[in-house]
Amino acid sequence: MKRVLLTVAMLSVFFSAMFAFFPDVPKDHWAYEYVWKLWQRGIFIGYPDGEFKGDRYITRYEAATAVSRLLDFIEQKMLAGASGDLAQVVGNLSDKYMALEEKVNGLTGILDTLASQIGTTQANLTETERELLEKIDAVKEEIEMEFDKEISLNREVVNNIGLKLGNLSRDYERYKENVDAKISEVNEKLAALEKDLGNKIADLEGIVNLHEKDIINIYNKISSVNEELNNKIAATEEKLSRKDEEISAMVELHEKDIINLYNKVAALNEDLNKKILDTKAELSAKIESQEKTLNMVYTKLLDTESKLNDEISALKEKDAEIQKTVDLHEQDIVNLYGKTSSLEEDLNMKYNETNEKIDQVKAELEDKIESVKAYNRNLSILTGAFFGILGLILIAISGK
């Protein structure tokens, strides 16, 4: 009776597949069996018009749909509920990587904003420099006109003032060179940081692509194991059909061995479930820790941006004070030079602080990348252990 029911079920599946399979996949195509197998298991269901479109490139959305159906199939047919936790872990891991990629993109935007603000500050400094030169030239021309009127009366005073103006011009040139050098160093640091961040983003994308390859490899291995299992089931059914009476007699003889084998399989299944739960907890803890660390990095970058904005506002206020004092006489210009020296010291201090913050963020990002790489190694070890245990179960079944 069981054989009749099994035959009817197989015929119903076969004829339903014949009438509902993709019409654009010919039977003589080299991939016909593979496509049919995926369609039969509900992994590939085709497009709304009922065709498979095998020559069309697959999109990331379609790949995600196929992988999701594959995980559902594994959960229902292969692991009897045990792989549901593994599928959830893989899904959570994918969500975490997407969130991580969004945060990295946000950090890139923040760095671009900082670079734009520094460029604006540099332009403001250039404009201030031009205005200072114009006012110095105007003062110089005015003084020279006064000197021309009184040169015959006080030649010594004229020479002293000319010497002071020359010293002031040289001091201003030195200050200009120092400011230009500092701005160039800041631009180089920003360029290096953008390049390094681009490399980190490329590494993260490589890690995501690596997980996609792992999922494809898992699918290929499961398909291979499933095909081998189907072949062995078919061979077993054929042997059972020829030796039904012999097996019935041997069941009583080997009943104890069968019970022992069942107990071993149950123990292996229990151990596998325990390892999966332990691995899930460990991965969840690591992912939560990485997320907290990335939030800290993001907060520090926001603080750095706020401090830079405050410093830029302070620099603009000092520029306004410089513009007011330029209209004064020689002593006021000397005082302006003293303020410029103080501003240069402040700029050096802020530059050093910015470099330290950039190095700190860089070190933290490198630590996060190492943590992600360590997690990938642990996931590869877990995958190898899973298929190793599955292979032992298949060997035990085939041996009996």
From Swiss-Prot:
Q: Which residues form the SLH domain?
A: 21-81
**Where does the record place the region 3 X 25 AA approximate repeat?**
208-350
Keywords annotated in UniProt: Cell outer membrane, Coiled coil, Membrane, Repeat, Signal, Transmembrane, Transmembrane helix
**Ranges annotated as spanning the membrane:** 380-400
Q: Where in the cell is it found?
A: Cell outer membrane
Binding partners and assembly:
Homotetramer.
Q: Which residue stretches, if any, does this entry annotate as coiled coil?
A: 85-379
**Among the entry's GO cellular component annotations, what is one?**
cell outer membrane
Top-level taxonomic group: Bacteria
**Residue stretches of each sequence repeat:** 208-232, 251-275, 326-350
Q: What functional role does this protein have?
A: Links the outer membrane to the inner membrane. Long fibrous protein that could serve to separate the two membranes.
Signal peptide stretch: 1-20
The name this protein goes by in its record? Outer membrane protein alpha
Q: Which PROSITE patterns match?
A: SLH
